[in-house]
């Protein structure tokens, strides 16, 4: 944690035993045009089934035009303002814009936002979740009972780290392919876990969130107007096309065989591999056996 001024662009991450990518407790970071795909379902991880896309967070961070594909969960886990250990965030401001999520396999695939920092300088958690494209795949259809964009989580350890405040969200323009209700009203696709003490209405921001607290928190100050995507983003449908574009989309170029296959599967709505004991998931089993869906 505590790394500063990070930019990951046109990278490809796959086949990890925990999360494919971790960008948490960072300051002034951008992750753009990257692919996170095919996490290992059952591998060397003693915790059991994983296949996680990533844990993303950080103070003043932007995530745009990235692709999650064939990951069971954490697509992404949005890391909270924890502030429990040295280097952890006491404030989180995120822009999560124009990303594509395909074939997730867990009901709470995108979740997080815990605002639990006990630091006296705690300053809250906020996110602009705008114009992202969700496309259910074979694993989603088989395993997810109710489609959702996001689940707001409570504290990791409720008895030790109670929530300090409600996390603030601006949900706008997100598309759930095949579901007109969630597409027209994004907040219908947001829910909370059973321990969260705040209501959905309390989470809502009515317009694009602008970071606050510059005067009191100089270490988190940045020239927001120069770096924000608030007036530069595409529609979710256009972002879907941009992310999957053959010569200018997400991933490292020229795309290798893995990334080329991943993009083809997103377009076709199919998958190649199955997680161990889980038909049509898209996740990679520990044996790496080539199983056709």
Model-derived features: positions:
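Conserved small/polar residues in nucleotide/adenosyl-binding loops
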Residues: 1-8, 289-293
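Right-handed parallel beta-helix
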Residues: 7-15, 27-46, 52-78, 82-106, ...
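Extracellular beta-rich repeat passengers
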Residues: 77, 82, 90-271
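Eukaryotic acidic, serine/proline-rich intrinsically disordered low-complexity regions
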Residues: 275, 280-283
């Amino acid at each position: 944690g505590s790394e500063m001024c990070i930019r990951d662009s046109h990278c490809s991450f796959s086949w990890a035993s925990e999360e494919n990518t971790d960008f948490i407790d960072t300051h002034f970071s951008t992750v753009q045009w990257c692919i996170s795909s095919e996490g290992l379902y059952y591998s060397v991880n003693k915790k059991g089934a994983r296949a996680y896309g990533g844990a993303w967070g950080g103070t003043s961070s932007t995530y745009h035009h990235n692709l999650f594909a064939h990951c069971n969960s954490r697509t992404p886990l949005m890391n909270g303002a924890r502030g429990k250990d040295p280097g952890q965030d006491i404030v989180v401001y995120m822009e999560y814009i124009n990303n594509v999520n395909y074939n997730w396999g867990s009901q709470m695939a995108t979740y997080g936002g815990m605002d639990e920092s006990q630091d006296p300088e705690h300053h809250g958690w906020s996110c602009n979740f705008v114009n992202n494209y969700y496309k259910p795949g074979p694993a989603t259809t088989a395993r997810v009972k109710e489609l959702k964009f996001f689940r707001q989580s409570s504290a990791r350890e409720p008895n030790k780290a109670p929530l300090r405040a409600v996390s603030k969200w601006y949900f706008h323009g997100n598309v759930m392919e095949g579901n007109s209700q969630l597409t027209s009203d994004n907040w219908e696709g947001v829910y909370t876990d059973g321990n969260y003490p705040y209501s959905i209405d309390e989470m809502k921001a009515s317009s694009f969130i602008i970071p606050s607290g510059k005067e009191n928190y100089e270490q988190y100050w940045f020239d927001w107007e120069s770096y924000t995507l608030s007036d530069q983003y595409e529609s979710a449908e256009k972002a879907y096309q941009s992310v999957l574009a053959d010569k200018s989309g997400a991933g490292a170029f020229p795309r290798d065989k893995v990334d080329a296959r991943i993009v083809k599967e997103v377009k076709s709505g199919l998958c190649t591999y199955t997680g161990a004991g889980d038909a049509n998931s898209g996740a990679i089993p520990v044996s790496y056996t080539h199983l056709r869906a």
